[in-house]
Amino acid sequence: MTQQMTLTAEISADLLGYRLDQALAQLFPDYSRSRIKVWIENDLVKVNGIIVNRARGKVFGGEQIEIQAEIEEEIRFEPQNIPLNIVHEDDDIIIINKPKNLVVHPGAGNPDGTVLNALLYYYPPIAEVPRAGIIHRLDKDTTGLMVVAKNIPAQTHLVTALQKRRITREYEAIASGIMTQGGKVDEPMARHPTKRTAMAVHPMGKPAITHYRIMERFRNYTRLRLRLETGRTHQIRVHMAHIAHPLLGDQLYGGRPRPPKGSSEAFLTVLRAFQRQALHATMLRLEHPINGELIECHAPLPADFVELIEALKTDYQRYKEDLYY
């Protein structure tokens, strides 16, 4: 059984010279290039309103894409009664505040116990929406806000909005090192050449842009507010590591805890107990996919993140007092 779904997008200028199938794979990363190629060959892809069936044809940027996608029904995942922290819900979307240690979608090593399983239990009709309406993902140990579509029209609009960078996603993080100013990381990303589970900055990768500003400085660490312009896998984690400021606790990208000299035992206990990357999706702003209403949601920092910040503040204050006296 297949589902019909309309996908729309605009070819961005940075895809100039790409083959059509390559460009569409960049625009629709949830679908494999082989599947996209089948859509092209089956006359399901229109470029500027005209059916195009040559996957190897070049694009120039600015073309309007419409795909009448045929999507095979996914394996039926099991609904599971996993609590969801719902921040906003209406007839078309759900916005949740994801806790740590929760995978978004079933995969290798995580066949169930995910956000997707929880959504199937909470709202059974979402089983008819591809990927149970999941528009974007957060890593297992990243906390915070995610938007989910409850029906196919909402999903189609949200996917397009994400591609056109009309959804604003802001994060808080603790980065290693003392940073002196905010800035922007504009570095393309791809799969790491040797680490199967990691991503890396790569000149032939997909465009990736992260903006960041300093909120607070501590000894050896800096609290940041970040905004995604694109949304690649592990983007903030990779970009911060690339500029030599990996996120505290991010073992995959070099962020193992580095206690400052003379740290108290109480501070060391908190630091050692924080066994994940210090990253939280704190704000999500979007236009409602059906009625166009502006929706902005905020998620407070989780308890372990608050405890970490308080410990960093206490350590910094103790250090300043020791200097003074």
UniProtKB/Swiss-Prot annotation:
Name of the gene this protein is made from: rluD
Keywords: Cytoplasm, Isomerase, RNA-binding, rRNA processing
Taxonomy, superkingdom: Bacteria
Localization per Swiss-Prot or TrEMBL: Cytoplasm
EC number: 5.4.99.23
Keyword field contains Isomerase: yes
Protein name: Ribosomal large subunit pseudouridine synthase D
Function summary: Responsible for synthesis of pseudouridine from uracil at positions 1911, 1915 and 1917 in 23S ribosomal RNA.
Class in the EC hierarchy, top level: isomerase
GO molecular function: 23S rRNA pseudouridine(1911/1915/1917) synthase activity; RNA binding
Similarity field: Belongs to the pseudouridine synthase RluA family.
GO-annotated cellular components: cytoplasm
Single biological process term from Gene Ontology: enzyme-directed rRNA pseudouridine synthesis
SMART domains the record matches: S4
Catalysed reaction equations from the record: uridine(1911/1915/1917) in 23S rRNA = pseudouridine(1911/1915/1917) in 23S rRNA
Listed InterPro entries: PsdUridine_synth_cat_dom_sf, PsdUridine_synth_RluA-like_CS, PsdUridine_synth_RluC/D, PsdUridine_synth_RsuA/RluA, RluA_PseudoU_synthase, S4_RNA-bd, S4_RNA-bd_sf
